[in-house]
Regions:
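Flexible "cap/lid" subdomain of the alpha/beta-hydrolase fold that forms the substrate-access gate
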Residues: 1-28, 33, 41, 61, ...
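The serine-hydrolase catalytic nucleophile loop
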Residues: 40-51
Length: 289
């Protein structure tokens, strides 16, 4: 039986941003390290059950981005994906991560791949969960969303429509056969943070910047081909934004990647932790330190 892990909750100042993070303390001091990069509209809280499941065996570290969760949201922060990556890259340096794998989910894909491009020699492997890096992985709705411009009439209203409790909850429930397995604290806590002063404007800015990620897809694909990191791909196949073709598309650049699809939506960890956690553990055990 696995031991109950010690989980720590800390905050560190990164260039004027109070970055909150949670980390597990494994029993072995040289345990593999996995940096958990969350998505939208959530924060490190989304990894709580994974950390309690695997935290005794691995050092799992999950920061909240600026404007998300318990991390501060300065008005003058650069709410772009470059800005998020700058902060998390500085966070990696501050806490002294030298060799680590990354768990990329949703927004964690663009953030993590920017970090990987800056420090390729530190990356031991990638766990990729509904984190798209291919045109084939964009649904029609996602294509329309990423094409939004601040100059488009009604564009900001469209974005803000996703930032309501109804919009947040639907991201959890869409594609889930049995919503009874979903804990309501996920979308409830997400909405609490979205409703804090300044948070929705930060999300609007990030939404308008999302096209920068699509433009970067070819460069990220080239990075994957060049460095060929070990990869585990776990994917909610019924994700309304990033459907199953996005998972298979990685095989063009990472032909040795392991792919597992699950009959669920965007937040696959919320519904399929018992299936995904052992896959992550087996993957981490195989990585070179």
């Amino acid at each position: 039986m696995s031991e109950v892990p010690r989980i720590e909750y800390r905050t560190v100042d990164i260039d004027g941003v109070d970055v909150f993070y949670r980390q597990s303390v494994p029993t072995a001091p040289d345990a593999p390290v996995l940096l958990l990069l969350h998505g939208f509209p959530t924060a490190s809280h989304q990894f709580r059950t994974l950390m309690h499941t695997l935290g005794d065996r691995y050092r799992l570290i999950a920061p909240d981005y600026p404007g998300f969760g318990y991390t501060s949201a300065p008005d003058d922060f650069d709410y772009t994906f470059d800005g998020l990556a700058d902060t998390i890259a500085a966070f990696v340096e501050r806490i002294g991560l030298r060799r680590f794998a990354m768990y990329l989910f949703d927004f964690g894909g663009p953030v993590g791949l920017r970090i990987a491009d800056r420090m390729p020699d530190r990356i031991t492997g990638l766990v990729i969960q509904n984190a798209n890096a291919y045109e084939a992985g964009l649904s029609d709705g996602a294509r329309e969303f990423t094409a939004l411009s601040p100059d488009d009439e009604g564009a900001e209203d469209t974005i803000r429509g996703l930032l309501t409790l109804e919009g947040t909850r639907s991201q959890y429930e869409h594609g889930v056969p049995d919503p009874a397995v979903l804990s309501p604290e996920g979308w409830t806590l997400d909405q609490h943070f979205l409703d804090l002063p300044g948070r929705k404007q930060a999300q609007v800015s990030l939404a308008f910047d999302y096209k920068s990620n699509v433009e970067a897809y070819p460069a990220w694909q080239a990075w994957l081909r060049k460095y060929t990191p070990p990869a585990l791909i776990v994917w909610g196949a019924d994700d309304p934004f990033f459907p199953a073709p996005g998972a298979h598309a990685y095989l063009a650049d990472l032909p040795a990647a392991e792919v597992h699809l699950f009959g669920t939506g965007h937040f696959a960890l919320e519904t399929h932790l018992p299936e995904i956690a052992p896959l992550v553990a087996h993957f981490l055990d195989r990585l070179e330190p």
